[in-house]
Amino acid sequence: RMLDKHCTLYQDIVRVPLILAGPGVEAQVNDNLVSNCLDLPVTLASLLGFAPPEGAHGQSLFGPARKTITSSGNGQQFGMFNSRMITDGHLKYVWNLTDIDELYDLDADQGECHNLIRERYDSPALKALRADLYADLKAHGDPFIRHGWLDGQLLGERKHKPWRESQ
């Protein structure tokens, strides 16, 4: 039942705790920020008083809070990884290029065992996550978005829906 989880986008893997301490860091703060490991170089540079590295994809954890975060693996040297995900901390959408997409309610299903993609395929919340994922992948030159030929699939217009054929 967990064979269709694709790559390594499990919530237990992509949601990693972080502890920061030192000058300029507020003590005893427990925050459920939506962030990315790519935010660490930018955050550390800002704490040390440096400008962020040119072309850095992250943003400082001490700046404006994000509403969503994306995750993708472009490890073509190790194989073909064709899943991308976005979460707002409550809903998690996984775009699977060659298979059925995944949608999880992280508040109700922390183990990501009940894929809601069929029930909520046309929901405004999912459409918003797809649009945000597309914008982020486009901004960072993701190889599946770069040339535009998969835009319709990610944005939901041309995604194959095998569960609708059986009805």
Give residue spans per PLM region.
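Conserved beta-strand positions that form and line the central face of beta-propeller blades
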Residues: L9, L18, N30, S60, ...
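A contiguous, mid-protein "functional segment" used to position or interact
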Residues: I117-G148
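C-terminal cap/loop subdomain of S1 sulfatases and analogous C-terminal strand-loop tails that border
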Residues: E26, L38-P41, A45-L106, G111, ...
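Active-site rim elements
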Residues: K5, G24-S35, L48-A51, C113-R120
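Histidine-centered active-site microenvironments of extracellular/periplasmic hydrolases
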Residues: R1-E26, N36
